[in-house]
């Protein structure tokens, strides 16, 4: 049995998967478009990096120690706890910031994305972080290789 309540949410009382039904193709489209505006995945980041797309930077929001152990190639380390106007002043405002952390169970990328957005940057969070990057079979780098002084100096 399907019913409609006062807030136009459809309720299917016959199962958990279909308990709450989408409210039509327009709202479904808007929902998924909204998600894709703020999230990306490792395979898209890798493909764009490999293809030489240069309209984004990859930001590692973890600690310098975690970054030194391994990170996405070419990533810039700015720990989320240290993100502010001064520590992000070298980042270009005309590029998208793609932020990641360790993966599921780590919310440094969410916190970093929020901070960067509050500072006026266009931001996407890389789903699954470094964990899903590696599960997809992509290589990582070790050590603080960026020429950015923040990589070595943030503690």
Language-model features: where?
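Alpha-helical scaffolding within the catalytic cores
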Residues: 82-87
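Catalytic cysteine-centered active loop of the rhodanese-like fold, especially the PTP/DSP P-loop
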Residues: 88-134
């Amino acid at each position: 049995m399907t019913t409609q309540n006062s807030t136009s949410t459809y309720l299917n009382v016959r199962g958990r998967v279909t308990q709450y039904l989408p409210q039509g193709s327009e709202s479904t489209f808007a929902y998924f478009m909204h998600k894709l505006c703020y999230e990306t995945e490792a395979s898209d980041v890798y493909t764009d990096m490999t293809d030489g797309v240069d309209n984004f930077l990859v930001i590692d929001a973890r600690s310098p120690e975690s970054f030194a152990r391994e990170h996405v190639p070419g990533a810039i380390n700015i720990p989320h706890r240290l993100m502010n106007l001064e520590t992000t002043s070298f980042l270009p405002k005309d590029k998208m910031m793609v932020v990641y952390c360790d993966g599921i169970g780590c919310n440094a990328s969410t916190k970093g994305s929020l901070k960067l957005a509050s500072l006026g940057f266009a931001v996407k969070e890389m789903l699954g972080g470094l964990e899903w990057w590696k599960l997809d079979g992509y290589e990582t780098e070790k050590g603080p290789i960026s020429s950015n002084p923040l990589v070595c100096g943030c503690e």
